[in-house]
Each structure stands twice: as structure tokens, then as C-alpha cells.
Amino acid sequence: MDIKIDISISGDKFTVTTRRENEERKKYLPLQKEKTTDVIKPDYLEYDDLLDRDEMSTILEEYFMYRGLLGLRIKYGRLFNEIKKFDNDAEEQFGTIEELKQKLRLNSEEGADNFIDYIKVQKQDIVKLTVYDCISMIGLCACVVDVWRNEKLFSRWKYCLRAIKLFINDHMLDKIKSILQNRLVYVEMS
């Protein structure tokens, strides 16, 4: 006698399905593959840790999206708190965001293109790109996203992803990830 039991766990709820129920369900559902794999993308907003399996490009995408749409008035975890500290590095390297806002006319129709052109020029001016240049660039993008959010240009956060891809390669993203991991461990230990 074969007994098939499927167990589905979601949060604090679980569902147990027996073989007979499976057979009944198959009659009414459209054709499906026998085995499906669900990919669950983590929500980094309230993350306190950074694991080796986490992708920095995905984390930055979520960071810019949240910051561009909601700002920092929402509750966020230690990971986003550490990334927010990159804003200070950006101001040290690039000057205040108000100066750049005027210089690049960020609020104009051409503001997004002006910003991308500025990023390209910055990359060309750097002889040897360091991880700290990249950290400053992440901070700069976050500050620019704030400007656009305040002007209700909510969809422009995606331009910051493009800027990051132009400026930072995968090797540097891995270095930034290591720095963030070390900072998070240090904060946890103190």
C-alpha cells in the first residue's frame, strides 16, 4: 500500500495533503510538471546579516528601490543601516548632494541622463578603481535616489542600478560584500 503525503509549510501555517487528495486535485488543475521548484527571493529590507549566498546586486536593487519609493522613514535592518553609511563617503568624495543636484540638473527631464554621463566621466577619471570609490558611488546613487523621490520621480531609482553596473564590476561587489559582512559581525559583537 502506497501512501503519498505532501507537506507545505508557509510561515506559521502548514498544509498536509494525502495521496487521494492529490489525485482529486490533478483532475481539476491544468497540466503541470510533476516537480516544480519555487525560487524564493529574500526581502532584504529588515535583514540584519549578510550571507555568502546573498547577491550584492540584488541587495542594492532592493536598497535603491525602497529608498527611491519609500525613503528611510520605514523600519529597516542592520544591513540597510550599514549601506546607508555609504552616504557619508559619497559626500566626502563628490561634495554635497545639493551641489550635484544643481550641477547635473537632476530634477530636469535630462537629469537621469546627466547623472549617467557624470558616472561615466567619474569612471574615466579614476586611474585605479578602489573599493572605497565603489562604496562612495553606492552612497552617491542613494543620495540621488532621495532627490528624485522628493521630486516624485519615483521610477528613476532604476537609473542608479544602471550607474552601479557601469561603475562597479562583480569583483568589487564581492569586496564590498566582505566589508559589509565584517561590519555587521563587528556591530553584532559590540
Curated annotation (Swiss-Prot):
InterPro entries: Poxvirus_Bcl-2-like (IPR022819), Poxvirus_sf (IPR043018)
GO BP: any one term: symbiont-mediated suppression of host NF-kappaB cascade
Keywords for this protein: Host-virus interaction, Inhibition of host innate immune response by virus, Inhibition of host NF-kappa-B by virus, Inhibition of host RLR pathway by virus, Inhibition of host TRAFs by virus, Viral immunoevasion
Disulfide-bond pairs as recorded: none
Pfam families: Poxv_Bcl-2-like (PF06227)
Keyword check for Lipoprotein: no
Primary role: Bcl-2-like protein which targets host toll-like receptor signaling complexes to suppress innate immune response. Interacts with host TRAF6 to activate p38 and subsequently induce the expression of several cytokines such as IL-10. Also associates with host IRAK2 to inhibit NF-kappa-B signaling.
Subunit comment: Interacts with host TRAF6 and IRAK2.
UniProt record similarity statement: Belongs to the orthopoxvirus A52R protein family.
Protein name per its UniProtKB record: Protein A52
Organism: Vaccinia virus (strain Copenhagen)
Lineage of producing organism: Viruses, Varidnaviria, Bamfordvirae, Nucleocytoviricota, Pokkesviricetes
